[in-house]
Amino acid sequence: MNIANRLRKIDKTSTVFTISDIKTVLGINDSKSIYNALSYALNTKELYKISNGIYSYDQSYSRKEFGNKYRTPSYISLYTVLQEEGVVFQPYSSISVITNRSEKADIDGQEYIYRKIKDRILLNPLGINEKNGVNIATLERAICDKLYLDGLEYFDNTKNINWDLMIQLNSEVYSNNLNISKFISVYKK
């Protein structure tokens, strides 16, 4: 059975795999053996190489899933979530990711913007959901991230905000950040 079929059999939802994922599925610990297996899989087009150490079945992989696996720990947030949730109306084609190191990367035709945040915030799971192998912020967490990183800002649509969650996030994750507190006091109805 080829690598791609073994990956599909074990993990039916993921579209992006690290070398570590592949080692686990194949039960190979030897570096030379995994290199040979990956080389064969790439030559026979079983797998597609996205970036060093990260692979998919083909070019139709989840860009958000890749964004999470390219830098770990991380979660999708900021304008990616705000646009999808209808809080900002301006279109953004880049994928915004919160992690422990700031960086811009253009990989396989997709721009990724990684923003650094303190570990105590990054590693707190409140307001982060896992959907189809992707760690993604809730609307409220994305707003808090934006306010925490960039200061007060105008958002086009604040109707669907769960204000109780905003208050809880500010208290438990962001240590009562002044910008988040001001935003809540101005916009909470």
What are these regions (language model features)?
Residues 1-73:
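Short beta-edge/loop segments at beta->alpha junctions of small alpha/beta modules
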Residues 56-189:
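Nucleic-acid-binding surface
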